[in-house]
């Protein structure tokens, strides 16, 4: 069940990386990028904690937020 939910959560990220991201300039302030972070967080921590970590990271990615190296815990 967790694998199915993880897969469903990763689909929009893969869609974004394949179709939307190539048409926009690079803007993520962090390394790894927010989409890479989301994929790694969901694969490493499962769908619930991974989604929480990914959303938290995306909310921090703005001009007045932090920047730099921020690995998945």
From Swiss-Prot:
Top-level taxon of the source organism: Bacteria
Keyword ATP-binding: no
Membrane topology, from the record: Peripheral membrane protein
Entries under InterPro entries matching the protein: Membr_insert_effic_factor_YidD
GO cellular component, as recorded: plasma membrane
Record key words, sorted: Cell inner membrane, Cell membrane, Membrane
Principal location: membrane
HAMAP family, alphabetized: UPF0161_YidD
Function: Could be involved in insertion of integral membrane proteins into the membrane.
Family (UniProt): Belongs to the UPF0161 family.
The name this protein goes by in its record: Putative membrane protein insertion efficiency factor
């Amino acid at each position: 069940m967790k694998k199915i939910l993880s897969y469903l959560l990763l689909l929009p990220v893969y869609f974004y990386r394949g179709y939307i991201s190539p048409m926009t300039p690079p803007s993520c302030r962090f390394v790894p990028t927010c989409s890479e972070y989301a994929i790694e967080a969901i694969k490493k921590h499962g769908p619930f904690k991974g989604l929480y970590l990914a959303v938290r990271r995306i909310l921090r990615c703005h001009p007045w937020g932090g920047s730099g190296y921020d690995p998945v815990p």
